[in-house]
Amino acid sequence: MFSASHFCSGSLMMSHPLSSLRDLEYHGAFVERHIGPNDVEIAQMLRVVGYDSLESLTDAIVPEKIRSTVALDLPKGITEEEALAKIRVIANKNRVFRSFIGQGYYGTHTPKVILRNILENPAWYTAYTPYQAEISQGRMEALINFQTMCADLTGMEIANASLLDEATAAAEAMSLAKRSAKSRSDLFFVHDAVHPQTLELLRTRAEPLGIVLRVGTPEEALQVDVFGILLQYPDTFGRIGDHRVLADAVHARGGLVAVASDLLALTLITPPGEWGADIVVGNSQRFGVPFGFGGPHAGFMACRDIYKRSIPGRLIGVSVDAAGHPAYRLALQTREQHIRREKATSNICTAQVLLAVMASMYAVYHGPQGLLRIAWRTHRMAAILAAALRGAGLTVGEYFFDTLHIVGIDALAIHCAAAAAGMNLRMIDNAQIGISLDETVTRSDVVALGQVFGVQVDVEALDAITADALPAGLLRSSAFLTHPVFNTHHSEHELLRYLRMLADKDLAMDRTMIPLGSCTMKLNATAEMIPVTWQEFACIHPLAPVVQWSGYRQLIDELEAMLVECTGYDAISLQPNSGAQGEYAGLLAIRAYHRSRGEERRNVCLIPESAHGTNPASAQLCGMQVVIIKCDRSGNVDVDDLRMKAEKYSDTLAALMVTYPSTHGVFEEAITEICEIVHAHGGQVYTDGANMNALVGVAKPGRWGSDVSHLNLHKTFCIPHGGGGPGVGPCAVKAHLAPFLPKTLPLPGDAAGLPVQGTQEAKVGMVSAANFGSASILPVSWMYITMMGAAGLRKATQVALLNANYIAKRLAPHYKTLYTGRHGLVAHECILDVRSLEKVSGVSAEDIAKRLIDFGFHAPTLSFPVAGTLMVEPTESESQQELDRFVDAMIQIRGEIAAIEKGHLDPEDNPLKQAPHTAVQVMASQWGHAYSRELAAFPLGVLHHAKYWPPVARVDNVYGDKHVMCACIPVEAYKEKGDSEIQDLIEEDASRC
């Protein structure tokens, strides 16, 4: 028989058993899994910082005026197994029907090799946005595959690396058209057959920007002067229209043509780029990404090359590295909010990278022939069903790809019959039904759908006699996806190895700490991720009847209550599917609140100069005038400047946007006074929730005077960053702003599952395509809060504060921390000021960031919020060992800088200026540097045991923006420049033998 001694040895052996079963039933185990340092390490770190407990450290950092005096009103934490069992009960309340609703969402098969090796793989889902090119080559290659896929299928010249959803992409297309069109009109024409959710978002976006929408038929568009038009192709009812004449007419008047389309349909029908479209948007969801009750899915935008400097969102481009080899990087970043602020093309920050990677690999796996087979099979199923229904005397649309539009029927009776058979159809009105088929449809599904209409379908017989239903004049003739990457990896082994090769090129949290300030790269626990792929969450259509998603309703209600308790607000919307959209929703709420009080004049938004770029970009989208507030020498909001400008704009003040703790990494003592000043002049206070990881369980913004915040569930509440998305940015408000949260689409669903009319009278439109945004990843945050419990959440915040101060303290002899609060402490992040070092040594913050790659680290945030600095946020999930590894690397780098200062290393030919160093460089036959290979690649002995090799040397940013290329690299570009020389040496060696 085994005893405890079989599992314990030496100092770890327990001298006596625990006293009771209650002690052994340790329900708080997950807290210790999530928080990196154990209690012994916490005590050691506290001694370094100079405090004897987490409580005393918290009291020293967090101002007393805002500090919570009572614990969060949340249950105690539970184990992973208990939480999974609890959420399984919730999931089982959802009813998974076969959904043929369509409206932009379609059934799909996620290839299992993609499910396991991307969606369930932390090498992909724990990565950050690829700002640091050298350690992001793998996911950027996947994203350039996505861009190539979208550009090829739409017939356009360039595409971005994903947007939040199709409706948001359409709104962005409208803004792009407004910026770029020659026409000075304020009118944007919208096809009356776009998806309803798209029209809702267009209405939300247009009004604050002074854009006038007109909805009508394509024929009516010929009669008006517009700066742009949006067409749906195929349209929401499945019809495939010929819009060539209309496109020519719009162009003749100086307008642009935007098209919302379907990537799978475009394998068969003429792509919009070939008949006059300037911009094409859509959703890549049906390329292997489940419904997810609305998301997350990767929207996309493709456009003509002349608009590349105005296209919103991330854009992956091709440059060269220091050795002249091809390398990927984020291209044309000066378009983006983190640089251009209120002048940016968009407020988009987080996009949908993980889902874009999945969609791109779906195309890689199937290739052009596989996609054609899927598209033709889907179309044949639809054509056979249409033939059967017509044969029974029903009226069905003539031309379509996958969606049948059936008119002149008792739609309610059909809808109910389908529901009784476990199927969802789209009830357009009392006399119209829509049926959208997809790659998951089988012959038995077609038979069952026919039976709903009382029609017997002989699939085999109808297949033999039924013609296709695509218009002959709009059949695609052009090739697509011709690059070798889409024609190589079609066996599972090949794709598996390709995915592994790409993942190995990158640094994600499965390999190292990612100490990015303002990004909160914390543990995304496996238990939190598991429910995401359950079919009860993944396979619910976002427009399914209410009675089918009571499990989701419970989960959403419970999560909203949890977040309200954590923040001190009164109401919350989970609809925003990014932090930027949460900001947008919050500012729209403020705007609508003022207008409801007859104060339309209030349009000034005060923003500190240290704010994240999304703040002014979001304010601009809401039609607000941005006025900048100075910061004082300590990095805090200059209260005198705030007071002066609040008085100056008292009659027009709408809001103050403030981040707390500040983007400078400190708890500002004057935050309550700041709120009082703004309120005294009629404004509302918007607190950016980006730094909520320093507040949960410690302070509540809704209690110190803030009126509204967005949260980042992909930061504070553990949804993974996915390499640049997905994210969820809930908007939380005080009670007086609750009526102005985003509206939702009416859904079918009374007690019997019959359609009922929505009754919500919202004053603010939708900000995302789906009512609950990226609903399928909400279980991640629910699991995190449930397992941590009230005490665990508070401890997580306290350890986040400790870890940041531990790093600042240990590095104090070597690097100056730019800003501190009282007692010389920082919040959950610290800014390391290296500007004085650069003046003496020539070594910049960027050089340090690149050198950290040689140590196996992702760099801290570079030059934000202060140019020439590094902002470090370690999060509570990092152990003391990992923190010390980072500190040791930074100390070694400081030693190298000192060697440059003393003349021991060359000012240019040194390991910092030449970093990072690739394996190819280090192992080359010639080493032309004045420092050793050992110093280049193994500056610390620990690296001999675990070494990350960057796949490329330092990437040339200037070259990349001068030579913009945003599609797959031609294979010949990879040919090594030195191949012939190496071959000559090999032949010379052979001749000697």
Swiss-Prot record:
Origin organism lineage:
Bacteria, Pseudomonadati, Pseudomonadota, Gammaproteobacteria, Lysobacterales
Can you name the source organism? Xylella fastidiosa (strain Temecula1 / ATCC 700964)
UniProt record similarity statement: Belongs to the GcvP family.
Reaction catalyzed: N(6)-[(R)-lipoyl]-L-lysyl-[glycine-cleavage complex H protein] + glycine + H(+) = N(6)-[(R)-S(8)-aminomethyldihydrolipoyl]-L-lysyl-[glycine-cleavage complex H protein] + CO2
Modified residue N6-(pyridoxal phosphate)lysine is at which positions?
715
Q: Which cofactors go with this protein?
A: pyridoxal 5'-phosphate
Q: What does this protein do?
A: The glycine cleavage system catalyzes the degradation of glycine. The P protein binds the alpha-amino group of glycine through its pyridoxal phosphate cofactor; CO(2) is released and the remaining methylamine moiety is then transferred to the lipoamide cofactor of the H protein.
Quaternary structure? Answer: The glycine cleavage system is composed of four proteins: P, T, L and H.
* Cited Gene3D superfamilies: Aspartate Aminotransferase, domain 1, Type I PLP-dependent aspartate aminotransferase-like (Major domain)
- Any matching Pfam family: GDC-P
> Which top-rank group of organisms is this from?
Bacteria
Q: What is its EC number?
A: 1.4.4.2
GO annotation, biological process: glycine decarboxylation via glycine cleavage system
Enumerate the HAMAP family for this protein.
Answer: GcvP
Q: Write one Gene Ontology MF term.
A: glycine dehydrogenase (decarboxylating) activity
Q: What's the protein called, per UniProt? A: Glycine dehydrogenase (decarboxylating)
Q: Which gene encodes it?
A: gcvP
Supply one GO CC term from the record: cytosol
Cite the entry's keywords alphabetically.
Oxidoreductase, Pyridoxal phosphate
